[in-house]
């Protein structure tokens, strides 16, 4: 699978996440499963010629759960973005 196909999948997942949020659902993209593809793929009944690119949980987040209170530091958008106007 080429880089272009992986980018297509990423864009599709982003659109699914936006559509889910518009319907009141939450999502959590997970790439950690990729390291366990040899375990996960047989459990899914996936053919040998398929790849695990990522996973996504879909549902209702418990906003009060401790795991959902983590706010990691983030770089300010203006520190890595150049806005071109006019």
Can you say where each PLM-predicted feature lies in the sequence?
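C-terminal helix-cap and adjacent tail motif
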Residues: 52-86
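Short, hinge-like loop/turn segments at secondary-structure boundaries
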Residues: 45-48
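Small-aliphatic-rich amphipathic alpha-helix that forms the alpha element of a beta-alpha
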Residues: 1-43
């Amino acid at each position: 699978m080429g880089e272009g196909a992986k980018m297509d999948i990423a864009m599709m997942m982003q659109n699914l996440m936006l559509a889910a949020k518009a319907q009141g659902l939450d999502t959590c993209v997970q790439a950690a499963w990729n390291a366990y593809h040899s375990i996960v793929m047989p459990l899914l009944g996936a053919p040998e010629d398929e790849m695990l690119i990522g996973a996504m949980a879909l549902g209702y987040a418990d906003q009060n759960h401790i795991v959902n209170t983590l706010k990691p530091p983030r770089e300010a958008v203006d520190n890595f973005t150049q806005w071109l106007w006019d």
